[in-house]
Amino acid sequence: MLTYIYQFLGFTALGIATTHHPKCKAIPGTNSWPSQAEWSHLNTSLSGRLLQPSPPGAVCHPTQATFDPLSCVAVAAGWLTTQWHTDNPVSTIENNWNNDTCLPVPTLPCSGKGYPVYVVNATCAEDVKKGVDFARENHVRLVVKGTGHDYLGRSVAPKSLSIWTHYMRGLEFYDGFKPKGCRKSIDGAAITAAADTQMLELDEQAHLKNLTIVSGGAGTVGVGGYLTGGGQGALSSTYGLGADQVLEMEIVTPGGDILTINECQNRDLFWAMRGGGGSTFGVITSVTIRAYPSTELHVASFLLGTGPGTEEYWDVMADILSQYPALDEQGLSGYAYIAHNVVSAEMNITSAADGFAGAFFLPAFHSSNTSLSLETVLKTLFADATAAYPGKFMSTVTVKTFPDFWAWYKDNNGPLDAGHNEVLGSRLIDGATLTGNRTALKQGYRAATPPGGLTSVFLVGGKGTRNAKPRGGGNSVNPAWRKAYIHSVIGASWNPLDSAEEAKQKALLTDVYVEGLRKMAPDSGAYMNEASLPSHALKYIRLKLTIVQAYPDEPDFQHAFWGENYERLLAIKKKVDPQDVLWCHPCVGNEGWELVDGVLCKK
């Protein structure tokens, strides 16, 4: 959740226009920006679905034309929910992606400087094409927003045209699927989902058909962003990543072509779009994925805890984490957290403590996969890890069986918090790191866990991601996923408009917490959908007319996110989008552009 470097000055003060700098994207207030007649023509072609939204928090500000105290009450309440931001054409789940430019707080400043100028409210592929064509022909910066649930801020930009796919919804189910242009059908269940189908809806509708899909833990994630970034979840240890499930996509290319891509046609794009990141190679209008027969799911909720600040705790954590590959071999997966000096009602930690808590899953594929076997595995794991420290640790393991993944998800996951300022950092941890140097493992996670905070140790890799067989023989998912067992995520947050605290938290995240994981697993990579942004600076400067934000540093993000696949991805990007109609940060091929005083220009 960090933003591009935005420097907001009055347009007349910028002195930058494409008439003088033809290598820059067009901006409002200059001769290069399309005329009102041109925007009106686009609106007519879209049957009136070209929006010019006010900043979403403007109803709370007396200086804004849309000021409405009654509406402000509703907006302020909705601001804290993910669905409210999803339903708004320009808002995002984290404030910092809009540079805190218009929060629903009357005492804070409000402007539209952090938001797109116009929005195409797309309902079909033709609408998307019209938006892409207009941006390309008029050299306007283009962004794509589905749900706004994007931890890299790719779904919003100032001085831009946005394509909003929110109303592109719909599902179609198949008992077998024949990709367009292919001679043979693919056996097994499949689902075609329109561009902005949310994963919560997809999970639920699959459940109603007695099917299960690979999905993550956040229901407001859109299917397009989830799959193009890789897509991890509790069942990826069984079936592979979300990108591994894709059978076909329909996309609009930067050149304005509406294409069906699969293993039989447009194969380079099919490879690139499954893991190469969103808003880069094209705009998804629909996607077809595999689905699997539902099966019972045994779920163990657990807590292992001790007093805060003990050396023994880190020894035990290193021992448990070293057993993750063995847990994967026994069919387990799930979500767990290392908690350091934490009080957490959600984790049942009622006083400051160090703990290890979460939920592990065991699908009932075999008669030996029972609730008792899952309970035994975890109780044995905790007993063995703490045997050297009698009386210093307490543990609980509670196992429950659910009819399928959806039943567990519905009972255990509510809406995520929203309307805050936050960034993430992450690392994929491979088996050699886990089973090798125990001291390095201990020191790495100790360095990566904030005091009073959490570090995730999600068991979402292993056999499923290693042995996945994506259609066409491969995809562009980070090769580090094929060796990884753990996806570790750390977050940092701060209050809006608190530049000093923001700089501090970003520096800690980059230079201390994520760096601890990088040193421990230097040859691995990161999951791009939940990762830090690259930058060469960690300064945060706020002047009266200028906002400059810099981001946590993911060194060499190209290879941290895509490994050896990056060079091929870059070649495909240059071929499919020679004009860089789609540009985002950090995305494939973005090296040729930079933000100059808030304007996107070629280097």
Language model: regions and residue ranges:
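Classical eukaryotic N-terminal signal peptides for Sec-dependent ER targeting/secretion
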Residues: 1-10
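Soluble FAD-dependent oxygen oxidases
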Residues: 2, 16-603
